[in-house]
């Protein structure tokens, strides 16, 4: 799939072909049909919201569910969905000090031994 990738702060986004991994038990794979880059994405781009790079921006999207993890019961393949891919717990130190993009809540993170969610096609 194509993605708007931020590789460096204060640099233009690069449209790249990326591959996605299979969804973990509580994840959903969505084939994006439309996405927008909003003001919060600009905060990532200018470094106001620190976040590990590279990062895919355009977190508000609409699409079709392609696959679901084993524990997902609220959507199924073929469902049309809208998304906001921001995930944070709201109670850790990062969240309470306004740095939700750094939330480290284990329930919201992919385990270190799991493959990356995204890979550039020529780097996969």
Where are the predicted features?
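Extreme N-terminal starter segment of soluble prokaryotic enzymes
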Residues: 1-2
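Conserved Rossmann-like nucleotide-binding pocket used by diverse enzymes
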Residues: 14, 38, 64
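Glycine-rich beta-strand-centered segment in the early N-terminal region that forms part
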Residues: 21-35, 46-96, 101, 109, ...
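Cytochrome P450 core scaffold surrounding the K-helix E-X-X-R motif
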Residues: 40-44
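A nucleotide-sugar donor-handling region in carbohydrate enzymes
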Residues: 104
């Amino acid at each position: 799939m194509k993605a708007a990738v931020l590789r460096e702060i204060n640099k233009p986004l690069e449209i790249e072909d990326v591959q996605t991994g299979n969804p973990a038990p509580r994840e959903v794979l969505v084939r994006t049909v439309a996405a927008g880059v909003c003001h919060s994405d600009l905060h990532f781009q200018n470094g106001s919201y620190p976040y590990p790079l590279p990062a895919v921006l355009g977190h508000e999207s609409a699409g079709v569910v392609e696959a679901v993890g084993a524990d997902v019961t609220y959507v199924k393949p073929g469902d049309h969905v809208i998304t906001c891919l921001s995930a944070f717990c709201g109670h850790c130190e990062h969240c309470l000090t306004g740095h939700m993009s750094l939330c480290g809540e284990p329930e919201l993170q992919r385990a270190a031994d799991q493959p990356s969610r995204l890979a550039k096609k020529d780097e996969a």
